[in-house]
Design a protein with these regions (language model features):
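Short, charged, surface-exposed secondary-structure boundary motifs
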Residues: 21-24, 69-71, 119-122
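Adenosine-phosphate binding glycine-rich loop
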Residues: 89-144
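Rossmann-like adenosine-cofactor binding region
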Residues: 36-109
């Protein structure tokens, strides 16, 4: 089973034209796991951005925007609505500008700490053949 099983459609909004081919490569890899319809658009296409967000249940920032060396937020308040779930894969800082904005708009939010730790757990399993104590790590480092 795939994490995207049951998802009707995914819109990927690419912020840099130089990575357009990488976007298509990602779509090809995702199709190996799911029959989900996946489309690639330019983030700079504001009309498409608005249309995509209007139909979305989940928004995920998978860029480096939000880290200390690339601060900021790619979305504006007028694009968000309270029923959206907004996830930011940036884990430092925990409360990125996107997370702050989404909370102020009434959205449910997911910060990057969980995905960061889960990625580390997968790496530990693959490389070292052991299970990382995810709950302990989350409690120790993130107070969760």
């Amino acid at each position: 089973a795939s994490i995207i099983d049951g998802v009707a459609e995914i819109d990927v909004l690419n912020r840099q034209e130089a990575y357009q081919q990488s976007g298509y490569d990602l779509i090809d890899r995702l199709h190996a796991y799911s029959e989900c319809a996946i489309s690639l658009y330019a983030l700079s296409d504001e009309e498409q951005l608005r249309a995509s967000l209007a139909e979305s249940a989940l928004v995920v920032n998978a860029t480096n925007v939000g880290y200390p060396d690339d601060p900021g937020c790619l979305l504006t308040a007028d694009l968000l609505r309270p029923e959206l779930i907004v996830a930011d894969l940036v884990y430092n800082p925990r409360e990125t500008e996107l997370i702050k904005l989404a909370r102020s708009c009434g959205c449910k939010t997911v910060d990057g700490a969980g995905p960061f730790v889960q990625q580390a757990a997968i790496a530990e399993r693959l490389w070292l053949g052991r299970e990382m104590p995810v709950d302990f790590v989350m409690e120790t480092f993130f107070g969760e």
